[in-house]
């Protein structure tokens, strides 16, 4: 599990909440807090009622064309990462997504949920880096 720590300031003092990254098939824990699915497709074989997803952020996942080109081997990971980063930069819905994250971090942890068996070779590292930059890690 990957963690990003944020300090959310409250009137009574500082509270520390985290953005976590977790595979959809991992055990759900109380510390997960608000769970956001960051994949375009629903995780195979996972029932919606078992996933405990609070928000499905299809809007920030790689486009269908980009995802398919990468999975078919038409483009390599480096090219995929560059193109996905560009999609994120041009995504007018990212601000809404960012707002949801910030609002939920005021209440507790946020867990980004994904299906990939190899997250290091998926869109996850690109999205993680982009979120860190936008939220000012």
Describe the predicted segments one by one:
Residues 3, 7-9:
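Short hydrophobic targeting helices and cationic amphipathic motifs
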Residues 9-137:
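Residues lining hydrophobic/aromatic ligand-binding pockets adjacent to catalytic sites
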Residues 1-2, 15:
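Accessible peptide chain termini
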């Amino acid at each position: 599990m990957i963690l990003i720590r944020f300090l959310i300031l409250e009137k009574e003092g500082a509270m520390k909440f985290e953005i976590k990254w977790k595979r959809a098939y991992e055990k759900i824990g109380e510390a997960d807090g608000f769970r956001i699915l960051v994949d375009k497709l629903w995780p195979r074989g996972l029932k919606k009622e078992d996933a405990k997803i609070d928000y499905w952020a299809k809007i920030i996942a790689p486009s269908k064309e980009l995802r398919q080109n990468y999975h078919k081997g038409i483009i390599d990971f480096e090219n995929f990462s560059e193109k996905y980063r560009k999609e994120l930069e041009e995504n007018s819905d990212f601000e809404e997504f960012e707002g949801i994250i910030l609002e939920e971090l005021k209440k507790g942890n946020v867990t980004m949920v994904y299906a990939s068996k190899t997250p290091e070779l998926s869109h996850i590292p690109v999205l993680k880096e982009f979120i860190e930059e936008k939220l000012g890690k």
